[in-house]
Amino acid sequence: DALPIYPATTLMDLIREARAYEERTGETHTESVIATSMEEADIERLMNWPHTNLCTDGGLIASHPRGFGSYPRFLGRYVRERKIMDLPTAVHKSSGLAATHLGLRDRGVIRPGMKAVFVLFDPNRVLDHATPEAPQALSVGIEKVWVNGEIVFEDGGATGRRPGQIIRW
């Protein structure tokens, strides 16, 4: 008879393996879990809840597709293809509503004196291509990105400018 396998035990085993790998190779941040436990219908209902804002917890090390594809996936698959909400609502949930929920008073709306990230995208083309196997695959339909007035992405790539700042609250 096989012993039962508990999720917590499996997680601890994975963490131990990741730590051992890091010690052998010198690499860091090697452990990653991509959970796929939600049904699409539940995700769509949650996205449409009036209080849901769209954010991502992608980090500096792009080892998860959300770092390169969260918003293009939302805009392309859910807004354009599945039509779960209109584009202005989607943009508000990704900007103004998110800033309000996070208490970021100097962001989230277009107004003089506010800090801003502007994304020029084609709503008919925007779509993610990042996968767990290729987490840094660029999305399509993103033309330019400005951060605090400086272009940081154009012509299919980063410009090298880094005018953003860490937000601590």
Spans of features found by a protein language model:
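Active-site microenvironment of metallo-dependent hydrolases
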Residues: 2-169
